């Protein structure tokens, strides 16, 4: 029986920073946010912090976002491992070309026991949920039947790995958009902010918006100043969105 799966977003990597011993400079931050500040101060040789209004790391980072000097954010990056995301949502995700992606392969991984993501509008209605899951079970049956028939058709191929790959790459054509995928996503902080501005918006698809808000929560833990301007709100339907006064590039 087809099983639904919940969204899981984990931050698995984030930029670290080792200040050069040759530069007389210190900061009250560390890691990615310290790196961004260092890059900015390197542009103007302001390691002595001549402006008291931007002497702290938080004040400095807020200033660069206020004036739009967000190219500095490209020096820091974060990597997420996302599971419990539908294949259709990953199609939206991979449109963000400044990210780097490594996605679960349907050619090499058997999808006969696939888990699925149920759209909330369907999931909240017992009758629609039942209909949806029956459709997924029927789809899985067809996929497995096709896969078995294709492997028999290719039995003359001596390479077992190639035989399975060829069968799966043909059978996957019937897999639904709701099929769970798993994907590793790496992006610099500027790219993550652009993604959040577009996909955490109330106008975005519900699933990709949930992914964006989950990513935001992880990013805030690592870089609270860089991402702290995004405010999460709960909409009338119970879903969440996030907005920032600094995000205008859509």
UniProtKB/Swiss-Prot annotation:
Query: Which key words are in the record?
Result: FAD, Flavoprotein, Methyltransferase, NADP, Nucleotide biosynthesis, Transferase
**What does it catalyze?**
dUMP + (6R)-5,10-methylene-5,6,7,8-tetrahydrofolate + NADPH + H(+) = dTMP + (6S)-5,6,7,8-tetrahydrofolate + NADP(+)
Q: Which GO terms describe its molecular function?
A: flavin adenine dinucleotide binding; NADPH binding; thymidylate synthase (FAD) activity; thymidylate synthase activity
Query: Which terms does the UniProt entry file under GO BP?
Result: dTMP biosynthetic process; dTTP biosynthetic process; methylation
Residues that hold dUMP according to the record = 92-95, 103-107, 172, 199
Residues of the ThyX domain: 7-233
Name the EC number(s): 2.1.1.148
Motif ThyX motif: where in chain: 95-105
**What are the catalytic residues?**
199 (involved in ionization of n3 of dump, leading to its activation)
Superkingdom as given in the UniProt entry: Bacteria
Required cofactor names: FAD
- For the ligand (FAD), the binding residues are 95-97, 103, 188-190, 194
Q: In which pathway does it act?
A: Pyrimidine metabolism; dTTP biosynthesis
UniProt keyword Transferase, yes or no: yes
Cofactor info, note text: Binds 4 FAD per tetramer. Each FAD binding site is formed by three monomers.
Q: What is the recorded function of this protein according to its Swiss-Prot or TrEMBL entry?
A: Catalyzes the reductive methylation of 2'-deoxyuridine-5'-monophosphate (dUMP) to 2'-deoxythymidine-5'-monophosphate (dTMP) while utilizing 5,10-methylenetetrahydrofolate (mTHF) as the methyl donor, and NADPH and FADH(2) as the reductant.
Complexes and interactors:
Homotetramer.
Q: What family, per the record?
A: Belongs to the thymidylate synthase ThyX family.
- Which NCBIfam families does this one have? thyX
Q: Read off the PANTHER family from this record.
A: FLAVIN-DEPENDENT THYMIDYLATE SYNTHASE
Designated name of the protein: Flavin-dependent thymidylate synthase
- Encoded by which gene? thyX
